[in-house]
Regions:
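SDR active-site lid
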Residues: 172, 176-243
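Substrate-binding pocket helix/loop in short-chain dehydrogenase/reductase
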Residues: 99-101, 105-111, 135
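A short, exposed helix-loop element centered on a Lys and neighboring polar residues
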Residues: 124-125, 168
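Active-site helix of classical SDR
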Residues: 124, 159-162
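Residue(s) in the substrate-gating loop at a strand-loop-helix junction
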Residues: 143
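Conserved glycine-rich cofactor-binding loop
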Residues: 19-20
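The beta1-alpha1 cofactor-binding region of Rossmann-like NAD(H)/NADP(H)-dependent oxidoreductases
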Residues: 62-73, 106
Length: 300
């Protein structure tokens, strides 16, 4: 038997990385559907930005997903302010400068995984007691890079595959508690993070130009947010946008070896990767930099 539709009216939703990009768009969408939102972000300006979204139904908390204590404090603030917490959306994420693995410093790999993997687990862990008590929902923001070849951005792809596995495991662990787990997979989303990490990098643009055009279709943060909200209302297990990625995910066991073989023989792709090999090592943004540009936290 399928679960009943989930009415977002008056539900309290905590969103990490909610100051820009997908997080901010999701907050706006959920507010329009009657929810109360709690934005948890590393940016010190978060409380004021939350008030700008809605003076009554939005709350901002300064939190770093790498620090469990700050997330626990954000959950406590949410409950103190709104009296409950129904949904947690682990949206905060980090995208490093494109590079081959051998040209990526170990510190940069660790920084990416600290936010995109450990930070997601920290977020869920902090919120779970409240979410279980409300038989609510957990939302994890993965990416099509969970199943698409991650050449040139291996740490990011690794992290999103890990988020997918987190979602699968949580879905079973929380089944007896009446909690739903939604994993969202997005391709290129038109955010500041993608502008900096993709559009402003000519080598990355050249690499993308060698891929099938269907893979390059973009969506807006609002489209991603609508997918999340729709998924919550139906207690969906997964949301994939654009929709064309659904069959790719379902057929990944067949398609991935075929695509990997094609990519490994494509001279354009190999030449671009050689250029990534030869340029200066990648540098992951510092926490201060991500605070100044909050939309770098998350994505596709």
């Amino acid at each position: 038997m399928s679960r009943a539709a989930y009415d977002l009216a008056d539900k309290v939703v905590l969103i990490t990385g909610g100051n820009g990009g997908i997080g901010a768009a999701t907050a706006r969408t959920l507010l329009r559907r009657g929810a109360r939102v709690v934005i948890a972000d590393i940016d010190p300006a978060t409380p004021g930005r939350a008030t700008d979204l809605h003076p009554i139904h939005s709350l901002g908390c300064v939190a770093d997903v790498r620090d469990p204590a700050t997330l626990e404090a954000a959950v406590a603030q949410a409950v103190d302010h709104f009296g409950r917490l129904d949904v947690v959306i682990a949206n905060a994420g980090l995208l490093a400068k494109a590079a081959t693995l051998r040209n990526t410093p170990t510190a940069d790999i660790e920084a990416t995984l600290a936010v995109n993997v450990t930070g997601v687990a920290n977020t869920v862990t902090a919120a779970l007691p409240q979410v279980i008590a409300r038989q609510g929902q957990v939302v994890l923001i993965s990416s099509v890079f969970a199943f698409l070849n991650g050449m040139g951005t291996i740490p990011y792809a690794m992290s999103k595959a890990a988020v997918e596995q987190l979602g699968r495991g949580l879905r079973i662990e929380l089944a007896d508690h009446g909690v739903s787990v939604l994993t969202a997979y997005f391709s290129l989303v038109q955010t500041d993070m993608i502008a900096r990490g993709v559009d402003e990098d000519p080598v990355v643009m050249e690499l993308l130009g060698a891929l099938p055009k269907a893979m390059l279709k973009r969506i807006t943060p609002e489209q991603a947010a609508a997918g999340i909200a729709d998924g919550l209302e139906s207690r969906a297990v997964r949301v994939i946008r654009p929709n064309l990625w659904g069959p790719v995910s379902s057929l990944r066991g067949v398609l991935n070896p075929t695509l990997d073989t094609r990519f490994s023989r494509d001279r354009r792709i190999l030449d671009v990767l050689a250029r990534l090999d030869s340029r200066p090592a990648a540098v992951v943004p510092t926490p201060a930099a991500t605070s100044a540009a909050p939309s770098r936290r998350k994505k596709p």
